[in-house]
Amino acid sequence: MLIAYKYRLYPNKEQQEYFAKCFGCVRFIYNRMLSDKIDYYNETKQKLNNTPAQYKKEFPWLKEVDSLALANAQMNLQTAYNNFFKRPEVGFPKFKSKKNHKYSYTTNNQGGNIYVSDRYIKLPKIGLIRVKKHRDFDGLIKSVTISQNPSGKYFVSVLVNQEDKEKFCQRKAEILILQNRN
C-alpha cells in the first residue's frame, strides 16, 4: 500500500538555489520535449520518442540537476499524451508556465540514495537537508517530491510502500527470530 507523508523542509541558500535550478530544468525539459513532439508530428505525422539524455549534449547545464527529476518530467509528459489520446476531453498537454508559483519536482529512490532521519533527509546530488519530521513511517521509500508554495516555503512529500500491518508484524517477528538464532 502506497502512503505519502508531507514534511516541511528548511534548506540553506545553496540548497534553495539547487531547488530553483531543478524546478527550472524540469519545466524546461517538459516544454522542450512537448515542443519537439509537436514539431515532429507536424512534419512527419508520427510520434517522437525522445528522452532527456538527448538534450544534455545541447544543454550541458541539464547535467547539474538530478537525472531522475528530468526522467519524471518525461514520464509526466507521456502520461499527459496518453490521457489525451485515451480521453480527448482531457485536452492536449499544455506548456508549463514560469508564472505559476507552485514549483515541484519528483525523484526516485534508487539503491537507498534517499533516506530520512529524525532531523534530516538525504537527497541525490544535494545531500542532507533539515526537515521537520512530525510523523514516523515504516516501509520502503519509493519517491520524494520537493515542492515550493507561493509564499516560498519548501515541503517534501515522501511516498512510502507500506506493507499491510499484519504482514509487516509477521515479517518483523520472523526477522527477530532469525536474529535471535545467530
Predicted ranges, named:
Residues 1-182:
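Nucleic-acid substrate recognition interfaces
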